[in-house]
Design a protein with these regions (language model features):
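Conserved catalytic cysteine-centered active-site region
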Residues: 1-13
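A broadly conserved amphipathic alpha-helix scaffold signal in soluble, globular proteins
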Residues: 2, 35-38
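Terminal-appendage/accessory-domain detector
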Residues: 14-17, 21-31, 38-168
Length: 168
């Protein structure tokens, strides 16, 4: 059921649950966009009221109170694809600022790893909930490590880099 929900694109819960299903979220969304474009080209009709209808997304997710005018103001004008990027590290994006800072400090002080006993990271509540807990391998150690500031910063300090193989 969890994989079915992830394919519907309705939840980011796999991130919180630390399951590898999170790895397919973006690909599934992109695939559905392509399927939808082909379906539209074949004149298959989707609901015109998918946002505003009684059972539309506004009703389901915002209790009918979403500001759709504001939300749709840039539709067809602004294309977010220009705001995307390739992640520099094979871990949750929320670990990246800490990794950037660690690598910057190591560039200035190459022996930093030998002098550090503890690292204190301050972040927003949501980032802390997502990646700030002590590292616990759990049922899926790879995903747990990818969503752990303690793990990723420790690896960065010890190895001077972080690579996909650090999560095997």
């Amino acid at each position: 059921m969890g994989l079915a929900a992830e394919q519907a694109g309705l939840s980011r819960q796999p991130l919180a649950d630390r399951v590898n299903g999170k790895n397919i979220l973006c690909g599934l969304a992109a695939g559905q966009a392509i399927h939808s474009a082909f379906a539209a080209q074949a004149e298959i009709k989707g609901s015109p009221n998918f946002l505003t209808g009684r059972f539309g997304l506004n009703a389901i997710f915002a209790g009918g109170n979403a500001d759709l005018e504001k939300g749709l103001a840039d539709l067809g004008k602004k294309f977010s694809v220009t705001e995307t990027s390739i992640k520099l590290y094979p871990s949750c994006r929320s670990t990246h600022p800490g990794l950037d800072l660690t690598f910057d400090m190591m560039a200035d002080e190459p022996d930093l790893a030998n002098r550090v006993d503890t690292i204190e990271v301050t972040s927003s509540k949501i980032v802390n909930e997502l990646v700030g807990s002590p590292f616990k391998p759990g049922k899926d150690p790879r995903v747990a490590a990818q969503f752990s500031i303690p793990y990723t910063l420790s690896v960065a300090l010890k190895r001077g880099k972080i690579a996909l193989s650090d999560f095997d």
